[in-house]
UniProtKB/Swiss-Prot annotation:
Disulfide bonds: none annotated. This is L-ribulose-5-phosphate 4-epimerase UlaF. It comes from Salmonella typhimurium (strain LT2 / SGSC1412 / ATCC 700720). The keyword Electron transport does not apply. GO terms for cellular component: cytosol. Belongs to the aldolase class II family. AraD/FucA subfamily. It is an enzyme of class 5 (isomerase).
């Protein structure tokens, strides 16, 4: 588990490095599928003082099996996503400014250009509002459930992120590093969409043929972007 703890620590430290978090407003996790264990950031521990050994290991029921701190308060959301989507290896939650602004506005982040299409196949969806009962009950678990409800049958690695209504963004990937990479991209395309819509409020979404080309050349069965 030490290698996975190091990966999760490094991914968490990338959040302030890329300007995605203020204070302790974020968390990254990763899963060991063979052992059924998840490594996640401890709750409320400052990035400036956090160490590798502060990472918390939990089982799939959220029980701490290793670590001296309580795990992130969002642990149940992470676990719900891992349980539903076997392809996920890492999950990240932040309150990055522009992605959170779309969440607070209750709007999907529109696919307006090729930067977006290189990573997200279509709009980045926004969930519905959680009911009072869902918030007063198992809030973090219900946050995971509403993400799953919103994604439906979408392949999660084709839409590697979402904004939770009035809350903020969650992103995921093949591992913790990939999840953070997608969170960084989500924040950038959220900012670009805000600027573009400000310049031209009547702007149309990216054409399907252009979106398909950009996404598939990086992620499709015959992808040719980058080096093998």
């Amino acid at each position: 588990m030490q290698k996975l703890k190091q990966q999760v620590f490094d991914a968490n430290m990338d959040l302030p490095r890329y300007g995605l978090v203020t204070f302790t407003w974020g968390n990254v996790s990763a899963i060991d599928r063979e052992r059924g264990l998840v490594v996640i950031k401890p709750s409320g521990v400052a990035y400036e003082t956090m160490k590798v050994d502060d990472m918390v290991v939990v089982d799939m029921d959220g029980k701490v099996v290793e670590g001296r701190y309580r795990p992130s308060s969002d642990t149940a959301t992470h676990l719900a996503l891992y349980q539903r989507y076997p392809s996920l290896g890492g999950v990240v939650h932040t309150h990055s400014t522009h992605a959170t602004a779309w969440a607070q506005a209750g709007m999907a982040i529109p696919a307006l250009g090729t930067t977006h299409a290189d990573y997200f196949f279509g709009d980045i969806p926004c969930t519905r509002a959680l009911s009072e009962e869902e918030v007063q009950g198992e809030y973090e678990l219900n946050t995971g459930k509403v993400i799953i409800e919103t994604l439906g049958e979408v392949e999660p690695l084709h839409t590697p992120g979402i904004v939770v209504y009035q809350h903020g963004p969650f992103a995921w990937g093949k591992d913790a590093h990939d999840a953070v990479h997608n969170a960084v991209v989500m924040e950038e395309v959220a900012r670009m969409a805000w600027i573009a819509r400000g310049i031209n409020p009547a702007l149309n979404p990216i054409d399907d043929y252009l979106m398909n080309k950009h996404f598939m050349r990086k992620h499709g069965p015959n992808a040719y972007y980058g080096q093998k």
